[in-house]
């Protein structure tokens, strides 16, 4: 969603577009660093706790990204956002599979996969529209209500289910 907004972000923050690409790079690098830590974190703190912490910290980081007054602060908040987003993908699959019986796991993952296939198509379209009609900060602010709803739903469904920790 942020890729198509780089020219607007760069212009508003008074930097060159090639500097603005750090908004994307910083997220990706931080995400790649945190992803392998997911297994260790879940063994230490539990799957539900880590997933909820990831979602809520992602919401906070998204809000801060929308408020960022400079490219440097935006990049710092994107690093945080990317780092806390790492566990969300594998843990969303793990929690989903724990909800369905083994014989329905293929169906559950098929529905999950549909969202991951639709997002890269809808994201840039939505990001472009939001940036053009509302403003680039809203590509980050839009994550706040969605993330809060996801955190509430996760807590409601899984608060009694937690994996053993070491």
Predicted regions and their residues:
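Extracytoplasmic
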Residues: 1-38, 88
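Helix-loop-helix hairpins in multi-pass membrane proteins, especially solute transporters
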Residues: 35-166
């Amino acid at each position: 969603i942020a890729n198509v907004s780089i020219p607007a972000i760069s212009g508003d923050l008074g930097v060159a577009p090639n500097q603005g690409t750090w908004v994307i790079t910083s997220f990706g690098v931080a995400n790649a660093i945190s992803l392998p830590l997911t297994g260790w974190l879940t063994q230490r703190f539990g799957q539900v706790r880590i997933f909820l912490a990831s979602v809520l910290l992602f919401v906070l980081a998204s809000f801060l990204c929308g408020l960022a007054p400079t490219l440097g602060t935006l990049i710092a908040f994107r690093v945080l956002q990317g780092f806390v987003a790492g566990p969300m993908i594998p843990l969303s699959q793990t929690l989903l599979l724990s909800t369905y019986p083994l014989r329905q796991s293929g169906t559950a993952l098929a529905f999950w996969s549909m969202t991951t296939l639709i997002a890269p198509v809808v994201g840039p379209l939505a990001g472009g529209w939001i940036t053009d009609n509302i403003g680039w900060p809203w590509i980050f602010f839009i994550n706040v209500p969605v993330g809060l709803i996801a955190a509430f739903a996760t807590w409601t469904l899984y608060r009694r289910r937690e994996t053993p920790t070491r």
